[in-house]
Amino acid sequence: MNEFVIDKKAMRQAFSRAAEGYDASAVLQREVCMRMLERLEYIKLQPARLLDAGSGTGWGGRQLAEKYPAAQVISLDIAIGMLQTSKSRSSWWQKLFGGCRQLPVCADVEALPLAANSLDMVWSNLAVQWCNDLPATFVELHRVLKTEGLLMFSTLGPDTLKELRQAFKGVDERSHLNRFADMHDIGDMLVQAGFAEPVMDMEYLTLTYEDVRGVLQDLKAIGAHNTTAGRGQGLMGKAAWARLLENYEKLRRDGKLPATYEVVYGHAWKPAPRVNRDGAAIIKTSFKIK
C-alpha cells in the first residue's frame, strides 16, 4: 500500500473524536470559509438544492442556509460525530423551522449517495484534500451537479505546514504529514472531469504558536493529524522528539513558531453536454422563421 494513502477508517475516527472541541481550534477553517463566502458574493446563483461536502460541525452550512434561506442544504461528512455535533449546535428555531431544509448525510465525498444531476451547487471548504483519488472525486462532484451548476471549494496546497515538514526531516523515516496537490494540477483535474471555466487562486495563511506542542495539539484538536497508511503506530521516542523540537526552534521568528498553510481556492461550472447519450453531437441553433 502507498504510504501516503489516507486510511479512511482512521480519519473517520479522528474527526469524530475531535468533533466536540473542533470549533475552538478550527481558526483556519473558519477564516477560509469567510473568504469563500466573500467570493460567493460575486457569483449570481440562487440554488434550490446545494451540498456542503465535508460539512464538519456545520458552521459553514449554517452560513449558506442564511444566505440561501429557500435552499435545501445537504450537510455531508464522513464522520458521524461531526454531524451529531452539528445538529446539537443548531439554534432552536433552526431545529423547529429549518430542519426540513437541512439534511445531514454521513458519507464519503468520493462516493456520494446522491442522484446524478440533482444539485445546483456543491460547496466544500478544506475537505477534498482528504480524498485519495482527487481526479475521480471531481468526476463524482460533476456527476451530481445539474447543468450550469457551480462547484466552489477550497483545499490545501503542497507548501502547507512546510515548517513542520522541514522539522521532521532527519527525525525518522516515517510518513508524518499528508501530501497535497498543486493548484495547477487541480485546475487540470477539473477540466478532465468535465468542468468549464475553472478559476484557481491561492494564498498563504500563517498561524503562530508558542511551541511545537501547540502546533501538534491544534492539528489533533481538529482531527487533521496524520492518517496516512505510512504513519507511525506508536509514540515518538524521546530522541526523535528532541530532534523535532530542535529543528523547529530554528524557524522561530519574532518569538513565535510559524505554521504556514497554502490555501487553494477554486470554482468551476458544469457546462451543457456536447453529445447526447448515443454519442451524437448536440448543436444549438438560434434563428427565427419569418
Curated annotation (Swiss-Prot):
GO molecular-function term, one example from the UniProt record: S-adenosylmethionine-dependent methyltransferase activity
Enzyme Commission identifier(s): 2.1.1.197
Keyword Coiled coil part of the UniProt annotation: no
Keywords, sorted A to Z: Biotin biosynthesis, Methyltransferase, S-adenosyl-L-methionine, Transferase
Catalytic activity: malonyl-[ACP] + S-adenosyl-L-methionine = malonyl-[ACP] methyl ester + S-adenosyl-L-homocysteine
The keyword Transferase belongs to this UniProt entry's keyword annotation: yes
UniProt-listed InterPro entries: BioC, Malonyl-ACP_OMT, Methyltransf_11, SAM-dependent_MTases_sf
Classification via Pfam families: Methyltransf_11
Gene Ontology biological process: biotin biosynthetic process; methylation
Pathway: Cofactor biosynthesis; biotin biosynthesis
Family, similarity comment: Belongs to the methyltransferase superfamily.
The protein's role, per its UniProt record: Converts the free carboxyl group of a malonyl-thioester to its methyl ester by transfer of a methyl group from S-adenosyl-L-methionine (SAM). It allows to synthesize pimeloyl-ACP via the fatty acid synthetic pathway.
Name of the protein in question: Malonyl-[acyl-carrier protein] O-methyltransferase
Organism from which the protein derives: Gallionella capsiferriformans (strain ES-2) (Gallionella ferruginea capsiferriformans (strain ES-2))
Lineage: Bacteria, Pseudomonadati, Pseudomonadota, Betaproteobacteria, Nitrosomonadales
